[in-house]
Amino acid sequence: MTLEPAAIAPVVNHPSLPLDDPGGLEISGEDAAAVAERVAREGLKVLAYRFDNDRWCTGQRFAAYRTLLGDTFDGRVLNAEAANTSPPPFFRDVVGCAHSVVTAHLVDQDGHPTMQARNEIIAFLAERLGTWAEEERGHDEPRASEPVPNPHASAP
């Protein structure tokens, strides 16, 4: 996705592929070089999350991302004890470990580590996309926080 010029706020959540190579990245060498070059050239930051005991998204995989992206890779690891202990059946029976930080294993409580991760992702996206929107919008266009006039609304 980061090869796509429109992707300006890359977030990697529990990347688990390839399944048979815990330290591998599911990307060709050519694409990996292009991603690393783009991230460096454009000053992008890549935000990533995983649980510490995740057997599908391992520390080896995060290390591979760090090797590829250097300091632009912000890999954050949550303690597996913070995961929702009652995930949906697929995650309980097939995945079998804390894996999906902001979905199946999210604990919807203020201040909880998984909610903090979710809030960090939202803040990252808002900051990155807000910066882009400021650069892209014309001076006569409303800000995102301003109501957008509806040209189809009838006059009062």
Question: Can you name each region flagged by the protein language model?
Answer:
Residues 72-156:
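C-terminal catalytic histidine-bearing segment of alpha/beta-hydrolase fold enzymes
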Residues 18-79:
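The feature captures the conserved acid-bearing segment of alpha/beta-hydrolase catalytic domains
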